[in-house]
From Swiss-Prot:
GO terms for biological process: translation. The gene is rplD. Pfam families: Ribosomal_L4. The keyword Amino-acid biosynthesis does not apply. The lineage of its organism: Bacteria, Pseudomonadati, Bacteroidota, Bacteroidia, Bacteroidales. Belongs to the universal ribosomal protein uL4 family. Gene3D superfamilies: 3.40.1370.10. Part of the 50S ribosomal subunit. This is Large ribosomal subunit protein uL4.
Amino acid sequence: MEVNVLNIKGEDTGRKVTLNESIFGIEPNDHAIYLDVKQFMANQRQGTHKSKERSEISGSTRKLGRQKGGGGARRGDINSPVLVGGARVFGPKPRDYWFKLNKKVKTLARKSALSYKAQENAIIIVEDFTFEAPKTKDFVSMVNNLKIADKKLLLVLPEANKNVYLSARNIERANVAIASALNTYNVLNAETLVVTENSLKAIENILS
């Protein structure tokens, strides 16, 4: 699949790049995508949730009534989970939600996500660029020139670029990622991928 290379003014440079079929042209595997996104979302959780159980709450431990002969059900103390205002049973405890996912599955998931974007013609290749200073105006101008101002976009750079990152930081529908940290969730969460030429080479090197 060939894609025209544009500059940040939205103009065609006259060059084309070929998207690697083994990365951008595979049959997407939805289950691999599900597992990778599930792991990503699980890793975002703090896992610090906690509720006090019967032995931890404040309250009297006096038995409410005699064991037998009262005519009603047996009663312990007022902390009993059976009673209104009593303790929580099997409440949440701090835990780590991380789970293992094989590298092959993660790679397949990223390839599947990129293939979906290629099928939707939602990948724009731009020549490598940088901003002389962090200016939101410059980033907005680029987005307008590429005619994607109404899209949620992910800009993929070959390496961290402070000026570009700061220029995009205040744009609600824009995110910036480096090629080596590209993940399935970010790819799928964006409506359009804007990938620089060197980023494309880096992605192909990583996923080949």
